[in-house]
């Protein structure tokens, strides 16, 4: 390479590098000098893994910033999920990126910078979610007493699921549906939230039944191991669940945010199974005890009612005592009824005799003769009256015809002739109707006369007694011993001689 002696220092022995050479030299120097380093800093700009699985962010403190990258393989081995603002200790190699003259750390391992940092982050998240009401006790749901299906969100290969299934089988065997998830690592939180939401979206009548209660379980571990159950998406999913949730994460001394959002917290996964289902043997014993108590109570109840019935029966008067007064009243009413019937019959007979005297056959016959005579007279007078009327009208027509022209007279004559024909027809019809009415009335009177006649009484099996003069005998007092009497029956008369009078017994006496 040519040198220009006009510039100062041009003849020195300083090596000359291209940009690529100096960048490569810097890269080798940094990597050789800082092989493995541990860097403490706060995560900044973290947006989660890229679609490739790698994660890009920065570590910073109050004076500097260091770009960082975690390749997919290392990302999957992390024991916790990185979050924005979390203070961590990253272990890895420093390197440079020649394309932009930047240096960065390629992280191979990363852990939270002590429990204090995680606890501070956890407390801040707890306060924020509590302010939203996600931990409100009023939102807690009651666990069903006897669930049919239990959903378990846990690892399918750990001892936790075996303990839960074994405990449920011992207490109250029922159907258990397991939704397998990772219970540690970067994907723990999203998988648990997906499982809780997935159980809630199951239809009641689908091929996979919808659980009546959920158990989210994991064994014990450090704060970093349990960090996935502090994830905000897990807390929101559990708080929004329409299915009651039991959290059983870690040991009794461990606590996570899911414990605050769940409807019930169990100290262990086995304890969660005990909370979820009752003991079948206890239920059977309780049922037997309740049945025995019910039988005993029913027996006592029936004994009390039986004793009360006996006491009431002893205090109740006998049937004869209860019926004595009504029976006496009935007997008195029966005795009065016979007399009342007799008196009423006598009154009705007197009333009937009065009407019968008013409607004697001779009176009816006389009335019938009068009606027939009236009808005959009307029949005789009507033709003469009509004839006189016609003669009068003809005379009037004749006088008028002499004074009027022929045409009007002819018209009026024709009209009058038509009127006369109508009058003739109406006369004939009126005479027929009158005669029919008189005949019907005569027939009715004749039937009434036959009905009221003593002969109809004879037809019904009675007899009429006549004295020697042929007059009917109406009272026994009018007959003396030795009088000759005639008894008329339906088919003839029989002569008899009266003996001493007999006293008619009073039907009301001797009752």
Swiss-Prot record:
Cite the entry's keywords alphabetically.
Answer: Cytoplasm, Exonuclease, Hydrolase, Nuclease
Q: How does it associate, per the subunit comment?
A: Heterooligomer composed of large and small subunits.
Protein EC: 3.1.11.6
This protein's species is Brucella melitensis biotype 1 (strain ATCC 23456 / CCUG 17765 / NCTC 10094 / 16M)
Location of this chain's protein in the cell: Cytoplasm
Q: Does the keyword Cytoplasm apply?
A: yes
Please give the family membership noted in the entry. Belongs to the XseA family.
The protein depicted here goes by the name Exodeoxyribonuclease 7 large subunit
